[in-house]
């Protein structure tokens, strides 16, 4: 990434604020947000601390949970708004493939009450390979709702705060850097943990 930045790794933050004026142009500040599942929520608090310290953020880079927090921050969500959003979500529903009860027919409602989760079966009762236990459609829907206004394919450098996120091509193991595209899709691809969430198919990948 060609960011002339001072990188701050959230979660391993050591902030030193100098009040003495420095000669020359201000150094660019970039925030790197790692993964870590639920622990990734700590990134929200880290962003709040950085803001309260008066440190301007010029770039945001994230992976997995960090890509979600970073992506939302890059389009204007404040740490307070993200904290409130996280607290009011039904995570047991989001981290499943359950259809909202209001959209289920009678058979689907009965099945959802009987089973915690299900796997697709093919011929001879063999489970079909799905790439992960969770398709993540409910999360994808949430990301789409939260990124209204940014559904087109865009250059992430042109977001209110330039953003990038990282994923992996499960076919060849190569790193995939997202600097453009559909923001919600990039966030979903970055959090596609092999064996847990099904991968996101993008173009020829």
Question: What are the functions of these language-model segments?
Answer:
Residues 1-26:
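Bacterial Sec-dependent N-terminal signal peptides
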Residues 20-63, 71-205:
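Patatin-like phospholipase
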């Amino acid at each position: 990434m060609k960011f002339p930045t001072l990188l701050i790794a959230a979660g391993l933050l050591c902030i030193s604020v100098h009040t003495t004026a420095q000669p020359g142009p201000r150094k660019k500040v970039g925030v790197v947000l790692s993964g870590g599942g639920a622990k990734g929520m700590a990134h929200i608090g880290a962003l709040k601390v950085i803001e309260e310290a008066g440190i301007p953020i010029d770039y945001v880079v994230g992976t997995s949970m960090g890509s979600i927090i970073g992506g939302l921050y890059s389009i204007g969500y404040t740490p307070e708004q993200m904290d409130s959003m996280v607290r009011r979500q039904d995570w047991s529903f989001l981290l499943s493939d359950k259809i909202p009860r209001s959209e289920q027919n009678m058979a689907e409602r009965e099945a959802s009450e009987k089973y915690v989760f299900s796997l697709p079966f093919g011929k001879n009762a063999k489970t079909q390979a799905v790439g992960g236990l969770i398709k993540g459609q409910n999360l994808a829907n949430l990301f789409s709702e939260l990124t209204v206004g940014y559904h087109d394919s865009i250059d992430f450098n042109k977001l209110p705060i330039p953003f990038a996120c990282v994923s992996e091509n499960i076919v060849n193991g190569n790193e995939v850097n997202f600097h453009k595209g559909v923001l919600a899709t990039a966030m979903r691809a970055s959090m596609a943990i092999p064996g847990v969430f099904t991968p996101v198919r993008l173009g020829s990948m």
